[in-house]
Amino acid sequence: MVIEPQLPAAALSALAELCRRYGRALYVAEPCGHMVPDARVVVSTALSGGTLRQRLRDACRRFEARRLALDLACVRMDFSLPAPYGTGTALTPQQLTELRGRRTVFFSPELCARYFTYEQSGMTHFVLFDDGDTLHRKIALGTELGIPAGFLALPEAMEALPRLLGKG
C-alpha cells in the first residue's frame, strides 16, 4: 500500500498495523518516514539543484537504505531562468521533442538527468528531462547505495521502458 499525502500519525499507525496483519508493505511519503518505523519511505529522484547522490545518501542516513524506495519520476520540465524556487513548466513528450529540435543535449551527472538551453523572447530557458538512460542510471545509483526498490509511473515513462527492460 502506498500513501502519498501526509496523514496524521494515528492514521498511519492504523494502516501500518493492517499491512502487518496481511503481510503487506506500507510505503509512505518522505515526510512521514519517521512516523512508522517499519514503513518503506518513497524518495523522489527528481531534482532541480544539488546532487542526486547526496540526496539519496542523506535519505539513507535518515531512514536506512533497506527502507527506501525510489520514485523514478520521468521529468520533463522547462525552467525560465533565473528559477530561484526550482519550479518549471511540465512538458509533454511532444513538447519536449519540438523544443529539443537540433539543440545540443548535455548530461548532468549531479542531477542524473539530461538538459539543454534555449532563448525565447529574450528569456533563457533550461529544459531538464529524463529518458531510459537517465532512469537506468538512477536505478543503478540506488542499487549501489543499497536501495532495494523503486516505482516507475506509466504512461509518463513509457518511452523509457525499452531501455529499462534491456530492449533498446
Enumerate the language-model features and the residues they cover:
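Chitinase-like catalytic core of GlcNAc-active glycosidases
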Residues: M1-S48
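Well-ordered, non-membrane alpha-helical segments in soluble/globular domains
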Residues: P8-E17, S48-D58, A90-P93, G132-H136, ...
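Extracytoplasmic/secreted cell-surface and envelope-processing proteins
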Residues: P8-S13, D78-A83, M158-L164
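A structural motif corresponding to the C-terminal end of an alpha-helix
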Residues: L18-R24, A59-R67, R137-P148
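Short, acidic/polar
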Residues: C32-H34, R55, D130-T143
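Residues lining hydrophobic/aromatic ligand-binding pockets adjacent to catalytic sites
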Residues: A39, R53-R57, F63
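Glycan-binding loop/region signatures in secreted carbohydrate-active enzymes
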Residues: A65-R137
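Acidic/aromatic/glycine-rich contiguous surface patches that form carbohydrate-binding/processing clefts
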Residues: K138-G168
